[in-house]
């Protein structure tokens, strides 16, 4: 058993194992899992959060990519009837397969920083079956998720996540809470998918396209960055000033631009 616990964090998996008991308890309090709920933990590592999540009485599925950690997790939790272990890549996982009709999934993870953004976008595709998500992320990423218009952090990640979810930056975590310590600060974020988006786009894919095009050259004005998609007249028809830069627009303005694009021939 001691050999199993000597697993070294792997750089290629972006592993930094959480060990600070105070931080672990604070995360568990924020999640507040309850009996009968369906939980999914992405990247359980050595099980720092897993034990507390199971202690809530919830049913817990975990996804772990590192096959060398599987024996440790089976040894610690394999006899628990409410525990299911999946060895694989969360970026390719069908999260909807874990829930029955009408059920909602609560997602938890100390996400590897090198895949956090693509994984969040993958999870947003399954937003209808997700109740909420609690993630440990690089602090800089959480600040981008929770950003407001007008600042340098406001961009594609902020807009697309805030289109789908309410974002709450809960608290920060220093490097000393991990082994090995990362070179950056971390933070806990809560993402709660909306039942209905506050600013519904006719086609969310077109919204993503508009946002991506706008921020490809974020220092230029909209009349220039959106030229491949929308004319100046189209931008003005969406009640947006074409002389503004993309970081000056709020989510509602981007949705109006996407809905204007949806009206053009070829997008209806």
Curated annotation (Swiss-Prot):
Binding-site residues, S-adenosyl-L-methionine: 16, 18, 43, 64, 89, 110
Transmembrane segments: none
PROSITE patterns membership: RRNA_A_DIMETH, SAM_RNA_A_N6_MT
Subcellular location: Cytoplasm
Highest taxon above the source species: Bacteria
Enzyme Commission number(s) of this protein: 2.1.1.182
GO-annotated molecular function: 16S rRNA (adenine(1518)-N(6)/adenine(1519)-N(6))-dimethyltransferase activity; RNA binding; rRNA (adenine-N6,N6-)-dimethyltransferase activity
Reactions catalysed: adenosine(1518)/adenosine(1519) in 16S rRNA + 4 S-adenosyl-L-methionine = N(6)-dimethyladenosine(1518)/N(6)-dimethyladenosine(1519) in 16S rRNA + 4 S-adenosyl-L-homocysteine + 4 H(+)
Gene Ontology CC: one annotated term: cytosol
Enzyme category, top tier: transferase
An individual GO BP term: rRNA methylation
Keywords: Cytoplasm, Methyltransferase, RNA-binding, rRNA processing, S-adenosyl-L-methionine, Transferase
Broad class of where this protein is predominantly found: cytoplasm
Function: Specifically dimethylates two adjacent adenosines (A1518 and A1519) in the loop of a conserved hairpin near the 3'-end of 16S rRNA in the 30S particle. May play a critical role in biogenesis of 30S subunits.
Family to which the UniProt record says this protein belongs: Belongs to the class I-like SAM-binding methyltransferase superfamily. rRNA adenine N(6)-methyltransferase family. RsmA subfamily.
Name of the protein described by the UniProt record: Ribosomal RNA small subunit methyltransferase A
Organism classification: Bacteria, Pseudomonadati, Pseudomonadota, Gammaproteobacteria, Pseudomonadales
């Amino acid at each position: 058993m001691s050999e199993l616990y000597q697993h070294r964090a792997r750089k290629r998996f972006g592993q930094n194992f959480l060990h600070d008991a105070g931080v672990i308890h604070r995360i568990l309090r924020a999640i507040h899992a309850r009996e009968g709920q369906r939980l999914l933990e992405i990247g359980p590592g050595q099980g720092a959060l897993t034990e507390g999540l199971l202690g809530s009485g919830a049913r817990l599925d975990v996804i772990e990519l590192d096959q060398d950690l599987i024996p440790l997790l089976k040894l610690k939790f394999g006899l628990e009837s409410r525990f299911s272990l999946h060895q694989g890549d969360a970026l390719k996982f069908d999260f909807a397969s874990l829930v029955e009709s009408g059920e909602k999934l609560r997602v938890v993870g100390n996400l590897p920083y090198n895949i956090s953004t693509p994984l969040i976008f993958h999870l947003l595709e399954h937003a209808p079956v997700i109740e909420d998500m609690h993630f440990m992320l690089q602090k800089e990423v959480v600040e981008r998720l929770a950003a407001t218009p007008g600042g340098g952090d406001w961009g594609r990640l902020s807009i697309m996540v805030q289109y789908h979810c309410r974002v709450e930056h809960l608290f920060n975590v220093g490097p000393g809470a991990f082994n090995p310590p990362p070179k950056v600060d971390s933070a806990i974020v809560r993402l709660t998918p909306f039942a209905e988006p506050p600013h519904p786009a006719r086609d969310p894919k077109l919204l993503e396209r508009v946002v991506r095009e706008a921020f490809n050259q974020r220092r230029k004005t909209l009349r220039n960055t959106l030229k491949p998609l929308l004319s100046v007249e189209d931008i003005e028809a969406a009640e947006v000033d074409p002389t503004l830069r993309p970081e000056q627009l709020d989510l509602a303005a981007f949705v109006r631009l996407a809905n204007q694009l949806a009206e053009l021939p070829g997008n209806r």
